[in-house]
Amino acid sequence: MTQFTHINASGEANMVDVSAKAETVREARAEAFVHMAPETLQLIVSGQHHKGDVFATARIAGIQAAKKTWDLIPLCHPLLLSKVEVQLEAIEAENKVRIESVCKLAGKTGVEMEALTAASVAALTIYDMCKAVQKDMVIGQVRLLEKTGGKSGHFKAES
């Protein structure tokens, strides 16, 4: 069984030492969904939401969150991200918004947590902006879709 990398021999949490690792190009994609009432989704899609452009705000929030992941998650390394992209798509037939994030860098540690944080915070921002009109929205299925680079190689989630 693979060992947890953030726990030392005494069972204490610690930050992994990556100083001896080689720099490689690393990329990760993650997704999240926000399920809502058709009326709420229509407010977003039509641009009629009283707080403004929900997707633009969520996109910027996701990008900012990726850059702050090291500050939010205690054992994450501060990273010099070379790319953060957050795409939002209204899926009207299913009354939900799909968020996909991509993070990339050339470095010694992966960007999975940054991609997951970007998608999660974008989803939270949608909730925050729309909670006045609907409080029972559901944020769900936050997951890593794919990652490349590094010692563990390529990972792709099953559809």
Curated annotation (Swiss-Prot):
The gene is moaC. Catalyzes the conversion of (8S)-3',8-cyclo-7,8-dihydroguanosine 5'-triphosphate to cyclic pyranopterin monophosphate (cPMP). Substrate binds at residues 75-77, 113-114. The lineage of its organism: Bacteria, Pseudomonadati, Pseudomonadota, Gammaproteobacteria, Vibrionales. SUPFAM superfamilies: Molybdenum cofactor biosynthesis protein C, MoaC (SSF55040). One of its GO terms (molecular function) is cyclic pyranopterin monophosphate synthase activity. This is Cyclic pyranopterin monophosphate synthase. Belongs to the MoaC family. Keywords: Lyase, Molybdenum cofactor biosynthesis. The active site is at 128.
